[in-house]
Amino acid sequence: MRKTKIICTLGPSTDQEGVLRELVANGMNVARFNFSHGSHEEHLGRFEKLKAIREELGKPVAALLDTKGPEIRLKEFKNGVETLEAGQTFTLTTREVEGTKEICSITYKDLPQDVQPGGTIMLDDGLIKLQIITVNDTDIVCKVLNNGKIKNKKGVNVPGVHLSMPYMSQRDRDDIIFGAQQGFDFIAASFVRTAQDVYDIRNLLNEYDSDIRIIAKIENREGVNNIDSILAAADAVMVARGDLGVEIDFTELPGIQKNIIERSFSFGKPIVTATQMLDSMIVNPRPTRAEISDVANAIYDGTSAIMLSGETAAGAYPVEALKTMSAIAERTEQENHARFVPLTENTGKISVSDATAHAACLTAKDVNAAAIVTVSESGNTARLLSKYRPEQPIIACVMKEQVQRQLALSWGITPLMMPLAHSTDELIEMSTSLAKENGYLHNGELAVVTAGVPVGVSGTTNMIKIHMVGNCLATGVGVGRENADVTSATGKACVCRTLEEVRAKFKPGMVLVVPSTSNEMLSYVRDAAALVVEEPGLNSHAAIAGKALLKPTVVGAAGATSHIRDGLMVAVDCAHGSVQRLQA
């Protein structure tokens, strides 16, 4: 089960017949809608298509609205594209002109007031570098420092300069309101500079009674410098390496990425690593070796999610890119499974819910639980568990579909819909049964269950229970699990403590339950449906006999002759080393 989540950007490539369905079916956790491009009508068409597919396939794929943000872009060239040459002059102007090789209009009217001669301007994610020569009220005359082609509406970055433009434009307001009204799950807020930028969006969402969660995209120096206050304000953060790698010295980028991921752990917030992760797959069917390492290293660092941009939005191999990223993640996680994050000495006082989540993760590790099951109204308990990166999968049982989708972004969480429970016993039974029905738990396995008491009160996570799944009577080690024909059997229990009891009571087809076996007992073992033995060891007489005679066998079933009632109908499951009582 892949624990690192994957975000895929939708676009022209995913509009092709069947592509979006393939993305949903092959593990896309979050669908990104890039509102820097396209109209509301265009995005709504894709959103409606996504909703229909996720409903049909039963996949809780979240929808993420990525805002345009306070960005600056070129307007349009007469020919759509121009080639700039090193040494020539090129003018950025706030006047409305037809773009040529010498001049082009920009979208931000006050840029001439924010820059100075000698400063640097980058075009198209830094592919073309300009040095400012002179500035007047409308024009910024620059020297081109390297050759390159430039197209319509490419980005303009001004590294190290605080822009006086307001954070939220009218366009962004309209887009955010659209997202709130349509039922999007996340807002990815572009170019967040301070915590106040996040609060401004939160206040707007509150006006529309929206529970959309906010992902703060870190794309400039101000965002990096204010990362702690931004993490405190936002619901998640994204290392948006495209613009960030232009706004800062690119040699700083790897260290900043690692630091932001590390800081996100301290705040218990999901962290997304994005931009150019499999960029070559826009045109090629396979990634470069460097891209494979890039994805893997982000996972080694502990990122919650990884993102595909142009690879799925406009690439030639969108489904292949997703499958490739998923395969890299799964393989990397096999070697990185022990990344449990302990509480550190300088953590300070934490909440009861946080302490309970940490204790649940430790308990699951100590008892080798198959899963951690949590019941949460808001999803916050599941996110706290995710913060500690336990080895066990986190099965989050929630009551609201939007909460289920929003948990799709968090590392290691599998969210399931569950009706409201009315008591603690009902909560435990319903949640573990739901996990079992969906194949995440099996009879005889241990689950660590955490929830809040009293039931139904949000924010009161304070209970941990170690729960044995099913009507389990005994557990041990299954023998012959590699042979699919002998992994399970059912029958009436014949509980015997001596060979004389076996001779007196046993009938063919029974499940023989004994302290140990011997050569004198082999004829009875041969006629038994299954064998349950208290003596441990895969080299024990019972283990060898059971394997040789192709009998479902569980050894090391401590207390089996005491816990299993003679004549009871039982099921022996070698795959999980358990003996279950069958319902009458």
Question: Model regions: which residues?
Answer:
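Short, ordered loop/turn segments at secondary-structure junctions
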Residues: L10-P12, M28, F35-H40, T67-P70, ...
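Expand to "…catalyze enediolate/carbanion chemistry for C-C bond making/breaking, isomerization
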Residues: M1-P12, Q16-E17, V24, S39-E48, ...
